[in-house]
Regions:
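Single conserved hydrophobic/aromatic residue that forms the stacking wall/gate
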Residues: 1-7, 11
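Conserved SAM-binding loop of SAM-dependent methyltransferases across substrates and taxa
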Residues: 13-23
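Conserved SAM-binding motif I beta-strand of class I
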Residues: 24-29
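Conserved SAM/SAH-binding beta-strand->alpha-helix loop
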Residues: 31-33
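S-adenosyl-L-methionine
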Residues: 35-75
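Mobile active-site "lid"/loop adjacent to the S-adenosyl-L-methionine
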Residues: 56, 74-104
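Helix-to-beta-strand junctions that scaffold the AdoMet/dcAdoMet cofactor pocket
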Residues: 109-111
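C-terminal catalytic and target-recognition region of SAM-dependent MTase-like enzymes
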Residues: 113-172
Length: 172
């Protein structure tokens, strides 16, 4: 079974896709409202009976606890925010924190992980930088391949694609 630790999943669809594919999912987001929205999407999508743990928590702290508990995951889908403030006023900025977050999350991966998907919707993190991070953190430990590209929204009026972020995936 595949389990996925998801950070902020913009449309909450990645969690549902993993659950629909048969995974046991831990959906982690620091925002109670986002977790509620994701849970509602699961219900509307007919997936409320799937094994999804809905957790309102700081993703990095959650992962650190899972490591201490000896829990492992076969896959991680990460969709972190560009910027955030913690309850104690801590500032989290994607460009400054992403490498360490990926490194921390790699510690909860099983011995035979399947994939690690990283999405970003900030202009400060290009596909090549994201690929480098995944290759450096995961490729050295597990081998595998990394691919990266832009994320875009189709524009019906022009037939073009409006770039809106980046994605990178490491897979075995």
């Amino acid at each position: 079974r595949v389990r996925s630790s998801a950070a902020s999943d913009v449309y909450k669809r990645q969690t549902l896709a993993c659950a629909e594919a048969g995974a046991s999912v831990s959906h982690v987001d620091a925002s109670k409202g986002m977790v509620q929205w994701a849970r509602e999407n699961a219900t509307v999508s007919g997936l409320s009976d799937k094994p999804i743990r809905w957790l309102v928590d700081d993703c990095e702290k959650f992962v650190q606890r899972e490591i201490r508990r000896g829990k492992t995951y076969d896959a991680i889908v990460m969709d972190p925010p560009s910027y955030g403030r913690g309850p104690g006023g801590e500032i989290w900025k994607l460009e400054d924190c992403i490498y360490d977050l990926v490194k921390t999350c790699s510690g909860v991966l099983s011995d035979e992980p399947l994939f690690f998907l990283l999405n970003s919707y900030t202009t400060g993190l290009s596909p090549s930088v994201m690929a480098y991070i995944l290759r450096d953190v995961l490729g050295t430990r597990f081998g595998g391949n990394v691919t990266a590209d832009e994320i875009g929204l189709p524009v019906e009026a022009t037939g073009g694609v409006l770039p809106c972020g980046s994605t990178a995936i490491w897979q075995k």
